[in-house]
Amino acid sequence: MKQETNKFIAYLAIIATPFALGAFFLAWSPAQQFSNEDPSSDGYVPPRSIERLVERTQESTVTVWCEPKGEKFSQGTAWAIELEKDATKEFPTVLITNHHVIDTCIGKGDVITVALPFEDPVAAELVRWDAENDLAVLRTTLKLPALGLSEYDTYPGYWVMALGSADGYEGSVAFGNVINSNRTEILVTNNISSGSSGGALVDNEGNVVGVMTWSLDEQQYNGAVSLNAFCVKILECKYEIKGEKTWWDYEE
């Protein structure tokens, strides 16, 4: 009887082992996806904590108002970037937005303000701009943490998040995927609206890959300016392809 019992237990162990191993790998594999810091390996999956990513990005994102006297005002989004050469004691935080958000304020004096969600607007200065690539640099009296810049180019299918002030709703979030990209533009499925312009497009690590810039009502995609476009007038870039500076290294 004891021998038969031992055989039965061994039989159960043989049956149970594959199921146990399967459960282990199902639990282990997703964890390994998120443990890889390189988006080129895991950039297709959402972050483990979307809530934490949203909160961290919101801390560095503001609404921008351009209100020239006697003219129609415009509204957009900006986000903090680390550009020490443009920061001052009075204006310690440097921001990136779109040129078209502030273009009517150029040469009009102190008519640009920014604000964190649901807080009062504060002064901002226009530092410089790149009209061709639709980028502008501001600085503000607010003290905000800078967002990191991604070390990796985007690929079709990558998970991305856009955060801004869609139609004036501050702190709006839109999730989506990269459809495709070229050297300076990224096509995404994220839903954006007027007011989202200038907002950061971040990967699943919370690092910026581009700036939300335009939308097409008749199409199912929207567009962002990639970090490569920053190399013209915004950032000092050390890489180059076909005679043009790039933020990402395409020769690796």
Where are these regions (language model features)?
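A conserved glycine-rich beta-strand in the N-terminal activation segment of trypsin-fold
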Residues: 44-51, 61-96, 122-123, 173, ...
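Catalytic-histidine neighborhood of serine endopeptidases
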Residues: 30-38, 75, 82-132
